[in-house]
Amino acid sequence: MKEHEITRQAREHFQKTINTMSDQLSTVRASRVSPAILEPVTVEYEGAKYKLSELAMVVAQDARTLIIEPWDVSMIPAISRSLQKANVGANPSDDGKRIKLVFPSLSQERREELARLVDKYLEEARIALRNIRREYIDEVKSKEKKKELSEDESRRIQNELQKAFEEYEKQMEQICQRKRKEIMEE
């Protein structure tokens, strides 16, 4: 039997929640430093604010080093100031052409702190998923009361919504489990 339109819409919302959580997780540093850790950094340059990615190319040189190559070397002081303000966990150093960020190895305490942050993001996403599910189930019940849906159809859609919820919740848990494992690796 074909999935109901309401369930399809709920799945889209569930997927957006997972995407948001994944974006949050990409900013959490694991054992390997990733350019995504600098996504939230904004740079004030010539009176305007820019995302770092709009002003420079960011690449991982190795597991602990990021290289930032600005499109224009005159931006280096502004980018360095922004990196220091953003408190990304490494002090910028430049050679006049590019900025280098060398991150220290993560202590066990810091790893545990980051794992707790991953758990926090997972719980926020779970709450969002539950709210989405509740919203759509309420919509189905409302349509049933208005006689737009039969009782059987309503029950079938609610079961579809529950199955979709469980499927997306499991996906989120797997994503977070991988991130936790990545963080705890030496």
From Swiss-Prot:
Organism listed in the record: Coprothermobacter proteolyticus (strain ATCC 35245 / DSM 5265 / OCM 4 / BT)
Family membership noted in the UniProt record: Belongs to the RRF family.
Location in the cell: Cytoplasm
Domain of life: Bacteria
Entry coiled-coil feature ranges: none
SUPFAM superfamilies (UniProt xref): Ribosome recycling factor, RRF
Keyword DNA-binding: no
Keywords of this entry: Cytoplasm, Protein biosynthesis
Gene for this chain: frr
Protein name: Ribosome-recycling factor
InterPro entries associated with the record: Ribosome_recyc_fac (IPR002661), Ribosome_recyc_fac_dom (IPR023584), RRF_sf (IPR036191)
UniProt keyword annotation of Transcription present: no
Gene Ontology terms, MF aspect: ribosomal large subunit binding
Function noted in UniProt: Responsible for the release of ribosomes from messenger RNA at the termination of protein biosynthesis. May increase the efficiency of translation by recycling ribosomes from one round of translation to another.
